[in-house]
Amino acid sequence: MPVARVLDQWFFLSGIDVVASPDTEGLVAFGDPLTDANLSTLDAHCRYPDQVARRLVKRRSGRSMGVMNQGLGGNRILNDLSGDSGLRRFDRDVLAQPGVTHVIVQLGLNDIFNWRGKPEEEVTADQMIVGLKQLARRAQTRGLWVFAGTLLPFENQSFRPSGVKPEREKTRQAVNEWIRGSGGDFDGVIDFDMAVLDIGHPSRLLPEYDSGDRLHPSDAGYNRMGDAVDLSLFEKLR
């Protein structure tokens, strides 16, 4: 008979629906392990969407808003890796969610790293931008507000050192430059990169925001990401 053991994952629960007032809005945080908060303290609720939710509860104006975390470890915009790619799962994990009105898209580092080393999965900034534009259009076609989050620094990351190449930092910078100027595609920008980078070394996380692998933020880093979200973005109505 198999030995029973306790795990810190769940395999049969994909979401929880709650009854809310008719005017309650819904925010989906759509992303990769930085949205799922890989390497954060277990059960400490330090994901950046957790911090956004806490701030929304405390604000004195605006409609009630629920926050749904659709972060997926290993996720990429363009190609499948750990589960379906962002482009393939967007309908299911965002557009099909009940009550969704706003979306934050923070996705792309795993595209840049190409963990599997397949030549056909080596992507350019232009290819990533095309994918991000498609996500924005699909959300806006459904009447949703959609915001883009910049990609975090990763110089000298030790999580999987094979992913570190000088040209990949150039790709990150090119994507971030486009995001910051993408007023015609997204409805707003959340500059997560600027919130957690080391000003003296902009291609690195600030040490206090680094979990230790120079890629995933610490609890303080994830909370800082949540503080970087301008809540006034959610007060506009189409």
Residues covered by each model-derived region:
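N-terminal secretory targeting modules
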Residues: M1-F30, T35-A44, S61, F234-R238
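Alpha-helical scaffolding within the catalytic cores
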Residues: F11, P49-L56, S82-P98, V130-Q134
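Structural recognition of the beta-strand scaffold that forms the well-ordered cores
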Residues: G26-G31, T35, M65-G71, T101-Q106, ...
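Beta-propeller domains
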Residues: L34-D80, I104
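Oxyanion-hole/transition-state-stabilizing segment in secreted/luminal serine hydrolases
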Residues: D36, S40, L72-Q127
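Soluble non-cytosolic domains of exported or imported proteins
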Residues: L42-R47, L81-S85, E122-I129, P166-Q173, ...
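Catalytic His-Asp segment of secreted/periplasmic serine-dependent ester chemistry enzymes
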Residues: L87, F113-W115, L151-R238
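C-terminal soluble interaction/assembly domains
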Residues: N110-N114, P119-L132, Q140, F147, ...
